[in-house]
C-alpha cells in the first residue's frame, strides 16, 4: 500500500470515531436532557431520527468547514475548523429542537445546555486532535528531503520548516 492510501485510511478511521463520539454525546444529551424538556417528548423512532439528523448535521458542517483534515492542515487550523463546525452544529441543534418540538418549557435553558454541551465537545475535539496528531506523527514520520540549490539560493527551506510535522530537510547541497 502506498503512503497516501495508508494516510487516508488512518484519517478516515480517526474521523469516523470522532463523528461517532460526538453523535453519542448528542444522543445521551437528547435522551436524558433535551427530550425531557419538551411538552410532548419524542418516542422510539422519533429519538432515532433526531440523533440521525444531528449526525448528518455534524458530518455536513465538519465537511463544510474542513474539520476532517487531520494531517493535512496544522493543528491550530484544524481546531479552528472544528470549532466553527461545532458552533454551526449547535445553532442547528437549537433550531431543529425548537422547530420540531413546537414548544419547549424553557428556551433559554435549552440554549444554555446546548452551549455547555458544545463547550464539552470543543474540549473533547482539542484533546482528540492532540492525541490524533501525536499518533499520526508516530505512524507517518516526516518525509526526509534533500534540498538542491542552484546559483540563486531560495527560501524553500524556510517554507518547508513551517511544516516540520510533514517534511524534514536532512541535507542541503549547492551546485554552481
Question: Residue ranges of each PLM-predicted region?
Answer:
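Signature of alpha-helical transmembrane segments in polytopic membrane proteins
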Residues: 1-139
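A solvent-exposed beta-alpha-beta segment
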Residues: 134-176
